[in-house]
Amino acid sequence: MAPNIRKSHPLLKMVNNSLIDLPAPSNISAWWNFGSLLAVCLMTQILTGLLLATHYTADTSLAFSSVAYTCRNVQYGWLIRNLHANGASFFFICIFLHIGRGLYYGSYLYKETWNTGVILLLTLMATAFVGYVLPWGQMSFWGATVITNLFSAIPYIGQTLVEWAWGGFSVDNPTLTRFFALHFLLPFVIAGITIIHLTFLHESGSNNPLGISSNSDKIPFHPYYSFKDILGLALMFIPFLTLALFSPNLLGDPENFTPANPLVTPPHIKPEWYFLFAYAIVRSIPNKLGGVLALAASVLILLLIPFLHKSKQRTMTFRPFSQALFWVLVANLLILTWIGSQPVEHPFIIIGQMASLSYFSIVLIVFPTIGTLENKMLNY
């Protein structure tokens, strides 16, 4: 019998082992769809971004006009721009759900996969941040100024670091140029780290909702999960296209319709919705350095999660107390997101401080305690 090229060709063999003949657990639910959705989001963002970059000018006097020109005069430029801007939102929705799945089902116990995932999240956040500055609207400019200025709180080297990042004494032309270079580069870095992420995942194989070994019952990825992923993709693209075509500016800031002006500060400086939870945590601490440390901790805390797992069971499927706590954490993050969008005044200040405190308390103290308690209740 002639050898199957899919299994013998050096390149196709790799694709085959990753996407076609990959042995997958037979019982993974729709929560396992988000990995492939993230891959599609990345490809969509790279494609639309590349098309936008061909019409964009990274210069403070031309950036705003070049984006407006793209939307008005380039064939389907408005569509490409709307897909790119809202694609970022869907990218973050998918990554948050993907992380939530990992937390709920104990996927973080695959430490290498989890750690590369956290690095991917940080890189994605950096990419989205520098990208938000490029249209050079009011919120772009002031967002860049406020967030980069936080680094000046780092003792001894802070101010030097910020001026080095800006390329001057304020956010100006050199800043915009380097942010464009970074925004162009980082998605390809994300693609590279994604390959590493998948390599680590395929070392162990996927986890499943029961948290037990699935070696006794595996099915090929294609056709089962390839078709399931296509269904997930269709279900994601419906709200994505609805948003991009019917209300493309819903998640944007109206301030960005005004070109950047260093002499006029917007009344409420706030980032895009997907950074609001972290922004609320920064603002809840009156000290600048404390705020920066809390900001870093709010995301880096994910790296500690494998070490805070005290339960004898991997997933939360059969742990009702941990489940309740998980949803309290989700509600807490939604409250933080809401607080981040509100002005710094009573009662939002105290609500933000309580939500920030409970966020760290739940993850660092309550989760391990509940896990230990459940072990005792089940006589483990």
UniProtKB/Swiss-Prot annotation:
| Coiled-coil regions listed | none
Any idea where this protein resides? Mitochondrion inner membrane
Topology versus the membrane:
Multi-pass membrane protein
**Cofactor field:** heme b
Q: Tell me the residue numbers annotated for binding a ubiquinone.
A: 202
Q: How is the cofactor bound?
A: Binds 2 heme b groups non-covalently.
Q: Where are the transmembrane segments?
A: 34-54, 78-99, 114-134, 179-199, 227-247, 289-309, 321-341, 348-368
Task: Tell me a GO biological process for this protein.
Answer: mitochondrial electron transport, ubiquinol to cytochrome c
Annotated disulfide bonds: none
Question: Which UniProt keywords are listed?
Answer: Electron transport, Heme, Iron, Membrane, Metal-binding, Mitochondrion, Mitochondrion inner membrane, Respiratory chain, Transmembrane, Transmembrane helix, Transport, Ubiquinone
Any single Gene Ontology cellular-component annotation: mitochondrial inner membrane
What Pfam families does the entry give?
Cytochrom_B_C, Cytochrome_B
Q: Where does heme b b566 bind?
A: 98, 197
Record-annotated residues binding heme b b562?
A: 84, 183
Instruction: Tell me where it mainly resides.
Output: mitochondrion
Q: Which GO terms describe its molecular function?
A: metal ion binding; ubiquinol-cytochrome-c reductase activity
Record PANTHER family: CYTOCHROME B (PTHR19271:SF16)
Family from the record = Belongs to the cytochrome b family.
Oligomeric form and interacting partners? The cytochrome bc1 complex contains 11 subunits: 3 respiratory subunits (MT-CYB, CYC1 and UQCRFS1), 2 core proteins (UQCRC1 and UQCRC2) and 6 low-molecular weight proteins (UQCRH/QCR6, UQCRB/QCR7, UQCRQ/QCR8, UQCR10/QCR9, UQCR11/QCR10 and a cleavage product of UQCRFS1). This cytochrome bc1 complex then forms a dimer.
Role: Component of the ubiquinol-cytochrome c reductase complex (complex III or cytochrome b-c1 complex) that is part of the mitochondrial respiratory chain. The b-c1 complex mediates electron transfer from ubiquinol to cytochrome c. Contributes to the generation of a proton gradient across the mitochondrial membrane that is then used for ATP synthesis.
Remarks, miscellaneous: Heme 1 (or BL or b562) is low-potential and absorbs at about 562 nm, and heme 2 (or BH or b566) is high-potential and absorbs at about 566 nm.
Name of the protein in question? Cytochrome b
Q: Which organism is it from?
A: Bambusicola thoracicus
Gene name, per UniProt, is MT-CYB
